[in-house]
Regions:
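Charge-dense, helix-prone N-terminal extensions
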Residues: 1-161
Length: 161
């Protein structure tokens, strides 16, 4: 069964135009996207859809792959108080630097300061138990550390993921 409110957007510009006109009135939309590392301008990539959604205070959620093999990504307004991944925070920082964030996207941002992310004590203790592991972890770029640890912490708090 095809989801409701499927957009015909074929790229980020078309999605952005739709969001500009509808982000305050619509409850959701679905876009056909491809996951993976972008390799072609002729494909609407998942990351492009997510970045555009974030610019308007929206977020990705459910995906559906239909019998024809097309994957649809659901986009919807972000709920107040919802969890933010470090990856999406970084996407917002990037979109802001590029001048693409809207006032609506900025209005829903969480604490974006370095103090806004703290490694859980039990995870930190586990990393520090082994000197080699801790040394390797510290050699990773700071963003990589935050994104990887955040993924673990989110899954720890939401086991259904």
């Amino acid at each position: 069964m095809k989801p409701d409110n499927v957009l015909s957007a074929k790229n980020r510009n078309e999605l952005r135009q739709w969001l500009e006109h509808n982000h305050l009135t619509e409850k959701e939309c679905w876009v056909a996207v491809k996951r993976g590392r972008p390799t072609s301008d002729d494909v609407f990539w998942y990351v492009d859809a997510v970045e555009e959604a974030l610019c308007f205070g929206w977020i990705d959620s459910t995906t559906k792959t239909l019998q024809d093999g097309v994957t649809y990504q659901k986009l919807a307004p972000r709920k107040k108080g919802s969890l933010w991944s470090e990856l999406n925070k970084e996407r917002c920082r990037r979109m802001d630097k590029l001048g693409m964030m809207t006032e609506y996207g900025r209005a829903v941002l969480p604490d974006m300061t370095p103090a806004g992310f703290v490694i859980d004590d039990d995870i930190l203790a586990a990393l520090q138990t082994d000197d080699v592991v801790w040394s390797n972890f510290q050699s990773f770029p700071e963003l990589y550390q935050r994104v990887r640890i955040d993924t673990i912490q989110i899954k720890k708090k939401q086991p259904k993921l």
